[in-house]
């Protein structure tokens, strides 16, 4: 599985991991777990709040781990990793693939950390593992300050057409969303038709819909849902769709936008300075 990228936050976690090893030349799962606690941004703030008081205990455990093992070379770290870390990283990629995403993030790795047996699963209580499971599985709502939103970009990829949905698009959009995403989204979007100003944008490629975004579907001043076919997600289409909707909302006088049940949080952080509420 090579067709994926790593989010900036997870990359920082991996950098913290390598920079915190002291004289040990191999990475263990507990090193990654401690790095996630120390990263302390957005969703990992909750992890920091819950576990930072135990960081010295974790460091002591890490100091007593073997210093001479046969490590595995890998694409994530310069430093070799032990077998458990290799298994955790492979598991996190499997979790990512099941969500149809192309970016490996800290949530996928955290889920794998509490699933694959290691010193991390040994030191965590059942209650602590349950807390992490809830943290990973709870959707977050984000807020965007539209007063500071000026990133609308008209320089779109000329290979794709982004336009407002028309009444004639109803059934094509419904079928596309139901087939590639889910029927709940499809039903919600279809309920907006007919209208003189449909709050939905479509991405057209070779006369076919390959993506969409919407606003006001989940409530006034709310953004979402949004979806782009997996094979087109590295063309900045998602960002363009997001910008279109947020710009519409800003122009009509909205001061904020709410992104409900946000998926890739870092995507929204980078594109529109969204933050968890």
Show the residue positions of the predicted features:
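Histone-fold recognition with a strong bias for associated Lys/Arg-rich disordered tails
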Residues: 1-166, 172-180, 196-198, 205-206
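Conserved hydrophobic beta-strand within the GNAT/NAT acetyltransferase core sheet
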Residues: 223, 257-261
